């Protein structure tokens, strides 16, 4: 029986991994579709599309799937699939933690209902557009990996008009920040300077963090974020939650 239980657990764990991988593929494919629709279907002339394709390849999405997603965005591939739109949702979690969600959906009513349920079941409230976004800033982020000469990085960052950079704890990576509209320029400048770019993306950052010390509230927030992230329509979830070191293992 012990062997059977272990096998059952392995199967459950594999199912979770497969489900997460499937959601990642869905997210990245939708991002390619939207990027191709908003600009040229050629990655050479569309930075948003180029970065979406790079993420997809890094995640192991087959080239034929990527090409199909580009064609869908360009309108040259019709399989009856609905159009996706980008929507931002905002709300509050337990303890007043601000939550910012970016989604790509073909049915905004379904997505809103799913999110409203996730919030209400975990002590939160889905709010109106703008209720928490003022607490966050939108930035371009270029992640560098490998051996990095800080003097060379400083010089390239100045040329690329970066706003700053910081090392990621317990890794060999550095994140370089810029204004949203400057991301493509910064990314190209860093590559031209010989740095290895792992990723270039837009990201939300909280202006101030909400420090919670109540273990139940922290667990509730983390559960809600996990529930929201599991929704197919959700692309990103950002909060202003700050977890004290004593609760870091929750």
UniProtKB/Swiss-Prot annotation:
Pfam families hit by this protein: TACO1_YebC_N (PF20772), Transcrip_reg (PF01709)
Gene Ontology terms, MF aspect: DNA binding
Protein's GO biological process: regulation of DNA-templated transcription
Location (main, coarse): cytoplasm
SUPFAM superfamilies, sorted: YebC-like (SSF75625)
Alphabetized InterPro entries for the sequence: Integrase-like_N, TACO1_YebC-like_2nd/3rd_dom, TACO1_YebC_N, Transcrip_reg_TACO1-like, Transcrip_reg_TACO1-like_dom3, YebC-like
A single cellular component GO annotation: cytosol
Keyword Disulfide bond: no
Keyword Phosphoprotein: no
Localisation per UniProt entry: Cytoplasm
Signal peptide: none
UniProt keyword annotations, A-Z: Cytoplasm, DNA-binding, Transcription, Transcription regulation
Family according to the record: Belongs to the TACO1 family.
HAMAP family: Transcrip_reg_TACO1
PANTHER family: TRANSCRIPTIONAL REGULATORY PROTEIN YEBC-RELATED (PTHR12532:SF6), TRANSLATIONAL ACTIVATOR OF CYTOCHROME C OXIDASE 1 (PTHR12532)
This protein's name: Probable transcriptional regulatory protein SYNPCC7002_A1640
Organism this protein belongs to: Picosynechococcus sp. (strain ATCC 27264 / PCC 7002 / PR-6)
């Amino acid at each position: 029986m012990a062997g059977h239980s272990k096998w059952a657990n392995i199967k459950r764990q594999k199912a979770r991994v497969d489900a997460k991988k499937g959601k990642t593929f869905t997210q990245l494919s939708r991002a390619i579709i939207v990027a191709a629709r908003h600009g040229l279907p050629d990655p050479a002339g569309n930075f948003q599309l180029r970065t979406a394709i790079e993420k997809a390849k890094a995640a192991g999405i087959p080239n034929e799937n990527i090409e199909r997603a580009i064609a869908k965005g360009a309108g040259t591939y019709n399989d009856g699939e609905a159009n996706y739109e980008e929507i931002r949702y905002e709300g509050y979690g337990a303890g007043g933690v601000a939550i910012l969600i970016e989604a790509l959906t073909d049915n905004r009513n379904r997505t809103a209902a799913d999110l409203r349920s996730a919030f209400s079941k975990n002590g939160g409230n889905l709010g109106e557009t703008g209720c928490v976004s003022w607490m966050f800033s939108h930035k371009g982020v270029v992640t560098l990996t490998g051996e990095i000469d800080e003097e060379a990085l400083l010089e390239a960052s100045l040329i690329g008009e970066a706003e700053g950079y910081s090392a990621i704890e317990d890794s060999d990576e550095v994140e370089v920040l810029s204004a949203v509209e400057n991301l493509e320029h910064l990314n190209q400048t860093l590559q031209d300077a010989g740095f290895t770019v792992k990723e270039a993306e837009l990201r939300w950052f909280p202006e101030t963090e909400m420090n919670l010390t109540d273990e139940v509230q922290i667990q509730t927030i983390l559960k809600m974020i996990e529930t929201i992230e599991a929704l197919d329509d959700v692309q990103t979830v950002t909060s202003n939650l700050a977890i004290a070191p004593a609760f870091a293992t929750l």
